[in-house]
Amino acid sequence: MGRGGIGGAGLVAAVAKADVENTDSTRGFVKDVKRIIIKVGTAVVTGPNGRLAMGRLGALCEQVKQLNFEGYEVILVTSGAVGVGRQRLKYRKLVNSSFADLQNPQMDMDGKACAAVGQSVLMAIYDTLFSQLDVTSSQLLVTDRDFMDPSFGNQLRETVNSLLDLKVIPVFNENDAISTRRQPYEDSSGIFWDNDSLARLLAQELKADLLIMLSDVEGLYSGPPSDPQSKIIHTYVHEQHGKLISFGEKSRVGRGGMQAKVAAAFTASSKGIPVVIASGFAIDSIIKVMRGEKIGTLFHREANQWGCSKEATAREMAVAARDCSRHLQKLSSEERKKILLDIADALEANEDLITSENQADLDLAQDIGYDKSLVARMTIKPGKIKSLAGSIREIADMEDPISHTLKRTEVAKDLVFEKTYCPLGVLLIIFESRPDALVQIASLAIRSGNGLLLKGGKEAMRSNTILHKVITGAIPDVVGKKLIGLVKNKDEIADLLKLDDVIDLVIPRGSNKLVSQIKAATKIPVLGHADGICHVYIDKSADMDMAKRIVLDAKVDYPAACNAMETLLVHKDLNRTEGLDDLLVELEKEGVVIYGGPVAHDTLKLPKVDSFHHEYNSMACTLEFVDDVQSAIDHINRYGSAHTDCIITTDGKAAETFLQQVDSAAVFHNASTRFCDGARFGLGAEVGISTGRIHARGPVGVDGLLTTRCILRGSGQVVNGDKGVVYTHRELPLQ
């Protein structure tokens, strides 16, 4: 395909339509990219043991194949031949050596011999991988002397253009086996001295639209990537970053390193070729770059015209929240209480503005065509602001949890041990859809003395922004407005999740996919639930009028809630009874679509459910018949999500068995699953519902945002082998 083709518009357009939030405004140029050069370094091609990293190479080839299929012209510049050849020759030398030979000092192998062996091995791997993907590749070996020939450039372009027209992937490498260059490697001739500068030179000669350089780190950092204080630079501006960057150690292999990549990238971008340095360890870095996502470091000739970002970095936001939380903890209980009361008043005073911004979000959501259940969760209904303000006042009136003493023990005479509550530190809450969650979470964070970072969904951006503004406006300067930070850019989440030295707990509130992604991406403890697959079991002794009320409430009251009923289990003896038939008719009248498990499908001719482990979040549910209470328990423990489950029965023994054996965070008897809520439990509000078993479980209120510390009050005691210490370990009254 010639350079006048449609390029990768299909991929970019499709992705942009699917996920606008991922696209960064500074990366909009990718929509016009046609010809791409991808440079992959030795540290990416090989593993720590020097052998080929087949998983990374496979992911690389799959991405190249995808781009090739979409109409992009892709050129690959690869390193790794010397390393691969050295590994192969070491093995060959080992098998041909005697024990005596191995006792002698081992001389390093000639790099040119390693390159000669490694080039064929490396290219054979590329050929095999691309062939499996129905892609043809070609090898082109060059040296710096080739570019000294004035006619070489024309021949190079002619050959590469012919290959690209045939949809062949050109794979370039420096021909180290016959290169006449000697150390130190430097650009004394103005041509190239490693594969980074080769990639830059090829980008210029072949008129590439984009150069992607894959490294063993995620991009360019302000300092060594191993330094926690180093920050990734998403857009390089030479005037701003040129003198501030300090480079760490060079790559463990190869001749380049980040300094060489920066030099090559800066030169290429100065010539008008955008460059992105990104991680070659991620399986989708190239595709993300082509989606316009803010990953890696961008070098662009016009970057200095874009201006410096005035927004705080992820680390700066987290550190500011921690500092403000310490100021908050210094206040008296009454002063902290007053902040909450002021927030409640501010919400009510700004109700019209809040509902106006929320309506703007709703209008946009409906225009885009978001699912009705999502729009329902976004909606701030009439009376909701008053209800939220009331919840905040309830939280303010709760006993102050900070420094609350849980235990006092006399360890020895005049030596007293105390265990007290204290704040966790800084919380990161990532939530979808529900702007009212922002208010609840913020009030609980303030009451518990924690700093807070909030990231809401793009669909409720205006609602979240105005609520954040109103709440922080009520926080006094002595504490600081940055106590609660609002993260507006999705790309910042990845940076925040790396800050395990600053952020103490992550609470994701949203889909199973969101929670799973967060857990996989961070070392910070994560609290929350992935699914809300809640069950109601109607036992054979159930009062069917009661059952009807509970089931209708659990399903219809708020079907998008995580504590709404998703599966209705019924004792087999109730099949075809008047009470159950009446209940099913009422559900259908309310508009509930009922899907059947195998038994219900056969006996009631209901549409068959695909999986019992399914959360509808809408006016739909699953119905299945079970043999007895034990069968119901087994079903719930197998297919449930450990959220909230309920039994309806007049049999006390069956109820107790259910309550004790269902392994869920909340288990009810004769009560709707919709009661599983922090406010309804008297917690004032909740940051979420945890289905885990560590730290907190069920609706998480103020107590779940606290940890403990040990205080020991002595009078000069020393251990000294426990000589002279008489341990009493006597429990003391709490003060």
UniProtKB/Swiss-Prot annotation:
Please list the GO terms describing molecular function: ATP binding; glutamate 5-kinase activity; glutamate-5-semialdehyde dehydrogenase activity
Where is the region Gamma-glutamyl phosphate reductase?
316-735
Q: Does the keyword Cytoplasm apply?
A: no
The entry's keywords: Amino-acid biosynthesis, ATP-binding, Kinase, Multifunctional enzyme, NADP, Nucleotide-binding, Oxidoreductase, Proline biosynthesis, Stress response, Transferase
Report the transmembrane regions from the record: none
Record's function text: P5CS plays a key role in proline biosynthesis, leading to osmoregulation in plants. Involved in abiotic stress tolerance.
What pathway annotation does it carry? Answer: Amino-acid biosynthesis; L-proline biosynthesis; L-glutamate 5-semialdehyde from L-glutamate: step 1/2; Amino-acid biosynthesis; L-proline biosynthesis; L-glutamate 5-semialdehyde from L-glutamate: step 2/2
Recorded hits in PROSITE patterns, A to Z, give:
GLUTAMATE_5_KINASE, PROA
NCBIfam families with a match to the protein in the record: P5CS, PRK00197.1, proA, proB
The protein's name in its UniProt record: Delta-1-pyrroline-5-carboxylate synthase 2
Anything else known: Tobacco plants over-expressing P5CS1 and P5CS2 have elevated proline levels and display enhanced abiotic stress tolerance.
**Where do the segments described as Glutamate 5-kinase lie?**
1-315
Residues reported to bind substrate: 79, 176, 195
How is the activity of this protein regulated? Feedback regulated by proline.
Q: Which GO terms describe its cellular component?
A: cytoplasm
HAMAP family this protein is in?
A: ProA, ProB
Q: What is its EC number?
A: 2.7.2.11, 1.2.1.41
Q: Which InterPro entries match?
A: AceGlu_kinase-like_sf, Ald_DH/histidinol_DH, Ald_DH_C, Ald_DH_N, Aldehyde_DH_dom, Asp/Glu/Uridylate_kinase, G-glutamylP_reductase_CS, Glu/AcGlu_kinase
Quickly give the catalysed reaction: L-glutamate + ATP = L-glutamyl 5-phosphate + ADP; L-glutamate 5-semialdehyde + phosphate + NADP(+) = L-glutamyl 5-phosphate + NADPH + H(+)
Q: What is the lineage of its organism?
A: Eukaryota, Viridiplantae, Streptophyta, Embryophyta, Tracheophyta
Q: Which family does it belong to?
A: In the N-terminal section; belongs to the glutamate 5-kinase family.
Residue numbers binding ATP: 215-216, 221-226, 255-261
Q: Which GO terms describe its biological process?
A: L-proline biosynthetic process; proline biosynthetic process
Q: Name one Pfam family in it.
A: AA_kinase
Which PANTHER family does the UniProt record give?
DELTA-1-PYRROLINE-5-CARBOXYLATE SYNTHASE 2 (PTHR11063:SF13), GLUTAMATE SEMIALDEHYDE DEHYDROGENASE (PTHR11063)
Which species is the source of this protein?
Answer: Oryza sativa subsp. japonica (Rice)
